[in-house]
Amino acid sequence: VAGMNGASVVSIAIIILYGFTLFTFLNTVLILPTRDFGRKITIDIKRKGNKKEFTILPIKNIKRYSLVILIISIGYLGTVVGFFDYVFNSFRNTDLFKNYYVNPEEVDIEFPDKKQNLIYIFMESTEMTNVSKKNGGVFDISITPNLENIALNNINFSNTELLGGARESYGTSWTVAAMIAQTAGIPLKVKLDDVSSNNSTSFNNITTLGDILSSNGYNNYLLMGSDANFGGRRAYFSNHNYIISDYYTAVEDGKIDSDYHEWWGYEDSKLFTYAKEYLIKLANDGKPFNFTMLTADTHFTDGYLDKSCSNVFSEAYANSFYCSDSMIADFISWIQEQDFYENTTIVLTGDHPTMQD
């Protein structure tokens, strides 16, 4: 299925089931009113002694019925799905990038003599609505209590006085687009027939975070437990001076068997174990490093619950976030115990808002 490489069999099966169920329901609802089952539903209207009968069901004027359904469908598509906004914005020019985009090639970026290491953690589908209501979320009890505590006690970029975040713009609402937006300052806007092409994400003419750090002596490393080729992630990061370790790297290095496949590749518990190994190697290399990683357990549908975690909430997705929150907190605690921590900045960010209600 196009765009679904690396997805779990369960996720694909659920999507197919939802699609089939919706298709069956809509067709049943739309076709039933036109069928004659030997019974009619009518309305009798009396006026000035005359009686007129109107047949409601079955519908005889199929063309008129089809036109009404078409108008309703267009209205739904335009308002609920946002098609009208999409069409309107497609023909509108914006000065956003003209006014706010800064070309790194045109400014002087100065680094201190002792350069800070950077650990950049992209957390799949993680947003601040996961925290407790008292701090800006939507839950009575936070499903990411550790991340909530970290945000409260460290620097947090918010759009409110409470815990909040950024509003995603066009071209930043899926993983590779979000990673490009956060490391290059631009959205991923490609043609539909080019969306899965590696050429669409190369951005050879753009100076990115990886380029800036590499030119200043940093080692850039990207770790993920899925296939880096998916969505053009390998093309983008390898083109901008990152060494990449993904699912297939783990197979090649003998960390997992070639027939091992859990969720999107291998689960986050292994991801954090491998991250510790790579960080120790990078720290011992003697050069400043930028270690970027991407989690996956909290991807929809319903996320993945690691075997080390238990069900705390009634919703499966909430349990997935709660489990991921615990693993991230443990990982950060481990980092804080390392010698390189005092000279390291940690960035925790969701790649994009959740795709599941």
Enumerate the language-model features and the residues they cover:
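Short extracytoplasmic/periplasmic juxtamembrane "stem" segments immediately C-terminal to an N-terminal membrane anchor
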Residues: 91-110
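Residues that form generic nucleotide/phosphate-binding pockets
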Residues: 44, 96-100, 150, 278
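Low-complexity, intrinsically disordered regions enriched in charged/polar residues
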Residues: 56, 77-81, 85-91, 120, ...
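Solvent-exposed soluble domains appended to multi-pass membrane proteins
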Residues: 104-357
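Arginine residue identity/basic-tract feature
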Residues: 35, 39, 47, 64, ...
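A diffuse structural propensity rather than consistent per-protein peaks
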Residues: 84, 92, 96-98, 208, ...
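Transmembrane and membrane-interface helices of multi-pass
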Residues: 1-90
